[in-house]
């Protein structure tokens, strides 16, 4: 162990107790501060009549000229000054110093001119030539479904359109028995397109039982469906998955992803070669919203709340009509707000008269919280798809692009 440094003893200038080595000399803080001030200022001390004054007399230093001379004689060195280390500086010096400091280094994303999302992506893999996927047939089938007469389709008694939608949802779900659900191990082009087709047509069929919706013109109906089917599917599949988990049919990581198919999020393979030249690892951040925390949190809340078919039908209407109206604005926004107001009255009647639950505000707030979480994920997906289009991440495009902007 090295010997400790000797930092005690008298000041070599005035003889007082030293506080350490300052500017190359063992000195007290007073003499060190004096030398720093005197050596940096432009003031010239007057001539000393004695030439060799006693530095410290009655606790005071009378002659600055002799004190400065003594500092230089014992070896104080002004080249050892350390500048720009003061915690408190005058505003002028501070501004001058800041102006000389270089700006902070650029982040990697700023330097490369690419967002953090795409730092690991190779520009040579960008797809400037797109493959068109024609989904016009889905829109044509949707128009045919909406033209059908569904007035006698449901033989049960209902009092309003919300109850009719609840019965329709139960009837649609009853077509796929639990024992016929198959587990998917791989998601590729064929599986993706089939799942999207099933989801879109399922949403169309459900909306076809909405009497107020059927009264709208065809353009308004198709605009709502194109904007709403993905959010409708997200919520409906979450609710269906929660129902299966409640019955102990599914594990915690399994979810419905089609009319008769499910997917284990902890054990499946994704094939993206049909839609992009980038690898799954490069697009991991882009693909994450489907499996992130919001998804499982919403699923857990649906398991605990166990919404009825009527409550779920209102949730489906709220999230779809709200997003469709917000996107389209104008007259369609007024239409969706009018439809939601009417269904809100039906839901109030359902709580008060059928469930005998006049204080339902807290429960409804929890259900709407799930909707807001899904809406947040949808906005995130739209933004990332926009980035993907700008940087040509995907090598496919759809004949109805507004239908798939949040997939």
Curated annotation (Swiss-Prot):
Q: Where is the NR LBD domain?
A: 157-407
Keywords recorded for this protein, A-Z:
DNA-binding, Metal-binding, Nucleus, Receptor, Transcription, Transcription regulation, Zinc, Zinc-finger
TM spans (from-to): none
Q: Where in the cell is it found?
A: Nucleus
Tree of life domain: Eukaryota
In its keyword annotation, does this UniProt entry include DNA-binding?
Answer: yes
Q: Which GO terms describe its molecular function?
A: DNA-binding transcription factor activity; RNA polymerase II cis-regulatory region sequence-specific DNA binding; zinc ion binding
Q: Does the keyword Nucleus apply?
A: yes
This protein's GO CC annotations:
nucleus
Q: Where are the zinc fingers (NR C4-type)?
A: 11-31, 47-66
Q: What is its main location?
A: nucleus
- Tell me, in a sentence or two, what this protein's role is: Orphan nuclear receptor.
The entry sums up its family as follows: Belongs to the nuclear hormone receptor family.
Quote the protein name from its UniProt record.
Nuclear hormone receptor family member nhr-134
Tell me the organism: Caenorhabditis elegans
């Amino acid at each position: 162990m090295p010997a400790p440094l000797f930092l005690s003893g008298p000041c070599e200038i005035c003889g007082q107790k030293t506080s350490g080595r300052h500017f190359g000399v063992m000195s007290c803080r007073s003499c060190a501060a004096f030398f720093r001030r005197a050596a940096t200022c432009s003031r010239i001390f007057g001539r000393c009549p004695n030439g060799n004054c006693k530095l410290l007399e009655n606790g005071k230093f009378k002659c600055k000229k002799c004190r400065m001379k003594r500092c230089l004689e014992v070896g104080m060195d002004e080249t050892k000054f350390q500048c720009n280390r003061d915690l408190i500086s005058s505003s002028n010096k501070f501004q001058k110093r800041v102006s000389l400091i270089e700006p902070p280094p650029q982040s990697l994303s700023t330097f490369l001119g690419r967002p953090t999302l795409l730092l690991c992506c190779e520009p040579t893999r960008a797809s400037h030539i797109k493959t068109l996927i024609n989904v016009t047939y889905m829109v044509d089938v949707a128009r045919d479904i909406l033209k059908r007469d569904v007035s006698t389709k449901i033989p049960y008694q209902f009092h309003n359109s919300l109850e009719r939608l609840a019965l329709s949802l139960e009837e649609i779900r009853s077509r796929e028995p639990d024992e016929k659900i198959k587990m998917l191990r791989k998601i590729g082009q064929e599986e993706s397109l089939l799942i999207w087709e099933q989801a879109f047509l399922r949403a169309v069929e459900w909306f076809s039982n909405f009497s107020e919706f059927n009264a709208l013109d065809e353009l308004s109906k198709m605009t709502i469906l194109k904007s709403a089917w993905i959010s409708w599917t997200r919520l409906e599949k979450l609710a269906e998955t929660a129902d299966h988990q409640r019955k102990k049919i599914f594990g915690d990581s399994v979810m419905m992803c089609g009319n008769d198919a499910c997917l284990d999020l902890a054990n499946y393979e994704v094939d993206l070669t049909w839609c992009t030249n980038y690898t799954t690892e490069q697009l991991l951040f882009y693909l994450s919203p489907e499996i992130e925390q919001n998804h499982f949190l919403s699923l857990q809340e649906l398991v605990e709340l166990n919404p009825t078919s009527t409550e779920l039908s209102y949730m489906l209407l709220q999230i779809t009509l709200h997003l469709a109206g917000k996107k389209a604005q104008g007259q369609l926004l007024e239409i969706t707000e009018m439809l939601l107001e009417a269904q809100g009255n039906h839901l109030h009647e359902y709580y008060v008269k059928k469930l005998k639950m006049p204080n339902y505000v807290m429960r409804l707030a929890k259900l709407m919280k799930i909707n807001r979480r899904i809406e947040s994920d949808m906005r995130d997906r739209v933004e990332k798809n926009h980035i993907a289009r700008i940087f040509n991440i995907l090598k496919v495009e759809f004949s109805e692009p507004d239908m798939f902007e949040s997939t």
